[in-house]
């Protein structure tokens, strides 16, 4: 049986991925310390094996033994908290990613799929193609891009296969809708539930690319399990719909 490990597997994107991996017959191990500024709750699948641990903890090392694929989603995933506590954000997102990669390398994992962010493009005008230079404007985005560089380095230097995804605005089943750091779709849903007007920040000319979590899950599984050319490994790929909507 194929064995997959998902970091952050009890959160929004991770829990959807866990469910689909189990559905297609994978044995799934989850590392999640249930810490998030955005999630009002966490989600569990009875058929998965859960470990309430920090990805930086050496106690997670043995969990990688026998694992085929690692899906690294765990992160401090909001800009606001990263500005309030940049050192912790960099520790989780950069050092934490290095720890995941090192443990995966030591265990002989076949491939690591890394979840990064379109925030790496900063305020550059669309289209946001992968060839654009990084424009990191906050600790969150730069810490995630550091993780990207680590993935490429582990591929080039150590031969650990990695694939890097930059997600745009992910929405769908289990998305956070509460708290000051909820994403924009969650905020809109919360306002609709409370019969409030939708809040538009700025002049209303902002455009965003929204991608359904089902598509993100499918991209992760394909990236992990399909044969890829050597040149495709350690590279960054956008995951979005390709359509810009005014928000």
Predicted regions and their residues:
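Conserved small/polar residues in nucleotide/adenosyl-binding loops
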Residues: 246-247
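Glycine-rich "substrate-gating" loop/helix at the edge of Rossmann-like oxidoreductase active sites
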Residues: 137, 168-182, 202-214
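N-terminal Rossmann-like NAD(P)+-binding domain of SDR-like oxidoreductases, especially those catalyzing
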Residues: 1-170, 224
């Amino acid at each position: 049986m194929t064995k997959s490990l998902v970091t952050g597997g009890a959160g929004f994107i991770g829990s959807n991925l866990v469910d689909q991996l189990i559905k297609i017959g994978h044995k799934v191990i989850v590392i999640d310390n249930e810490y998030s500024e955005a999630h009002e709750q966490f989600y569990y699948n009875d058929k998965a094996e859960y470990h309430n641990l920090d990805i930086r903890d050496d106690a997670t090392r043995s969990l990688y033994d026998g694992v085929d694929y690692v899906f690294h989603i765990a992160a401090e995933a909001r800009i606001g908290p990263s500005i309030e506590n940049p050192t912790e954000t960099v520790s989780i997102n950069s050092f934490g990613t290095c720890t995941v990669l090192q443990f995966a390398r030591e265990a002989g994992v076949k491939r690591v799929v890394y979840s990064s962010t379109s925030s790496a493009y900063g305020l550059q005008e669309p289209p946001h193609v992968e060839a654009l230079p990084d424009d990191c404007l906050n600790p969150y985005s730069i810490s995630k891009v550091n993780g990207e560089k680590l993935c490429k380095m582990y591929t080039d230097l150590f031969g650990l296969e990695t694939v890097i995804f930059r997600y745009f605005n992910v929405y769908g089943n289990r998305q956070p809708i509460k708290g000051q750091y909820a994403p924009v779709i969650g905020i809109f849903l919360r306002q609709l539930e409370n019969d409030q007007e939708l809040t538009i920040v700025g002049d209303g000319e902002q455009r965003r690319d929204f991608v359904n979590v089902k598509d993100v899950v499918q991209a992760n599984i394909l990236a992990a399990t399909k044969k890829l050319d050597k040149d495709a490994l350690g590279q960054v790929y956008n995951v979005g719909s390709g359509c810009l909507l005014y928000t």
